[in-house]
Design a protein with these regions (language model features):
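Short sequence/structural segments immediately N-terminal
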Residues: 2-187
């Protein structure tokens, strides 16, 4: 075998090895890296600290921390902002709503005078900002519970179209109007 044949054979082997390496990178490394970046991004943008980075959310994070769902309960369990304020019925809905809400909040924070937002009026539309699927993620045994049985039975049977926060209005943010006043927002 002359040197040209050996060189040609080596080039073919290197070509095959290159294809295998690129295939492994494309099939294993890139998806794993994308998953890790995505997972870390979701985790980093899901806690109360991230939400309170925007000054306008401070009264809501504080009033949440002062509530049963913020950890003021016998078990010390605390819900995150995303537990209640994002849908948990599917990963797709969670992802798209997280993206939509995030873009909206950044836009409002950057290009609006947030001191002019009537936060009290927004609390009257809490059904638009809280998802029953979030409530039911934690309260998995609610359908079998005996407290409020008639109302909950009607809810699960679809007889009423109320949402959880229709009846449980201040459950996630205790004394929210007080916190809004302390942060100099219009109640």
């Amino acid at each position: 075998m002359n040197w040209l044949d050996r060189l040609s054979r080596t080039a073919k082997i290197l070509g095959v090895v290159s294809i295998v390496v690129f295939a492994l990178i494309a099939v294993v490394v890139l998806p794993a890296a994308a998953w890790l970046v995505g997972d870390e991004s979701f985790t980093a943008t899901s806690d109360d600290g991230f939400c309170s980075d925007c000054h306008t959310m401070e009264p809501f994070v504080a009033s949440s921390a002062d509530s049963v769902h913020g950890g003021v309960n016998s078990a010390g369990i605390a819900a995150k902002c995303t537990t209640c304020h994002l849908p948990h019925d599917s990963s797709w809905n969670y992802l798209t709503e997280k993206l939509r809400t995030g873009v909206h909040d950044i836009w409002v924070q950057t290009f609006s005078d947030t001191s002019q937002i009537d936060w009290k009026a927004k609390t009257e539309h809490r059904e638009d900002f809280v998802y029953d699927s979030g409530c039911l993620t934690c309260h998995v045994e609610l359908e079998a519970a005996t407290a409020g049985k008639r109302q909950h039975d009607n809810y699960f049977a679809g007889i009423i179209d109320s949402k959880c926060v229709t009846c449980h209005a201040g459950i996630g943010h205790s004394n929210v109007n007080q916190y809004l006043l302390e942060h100099k927002y219009r109640p």
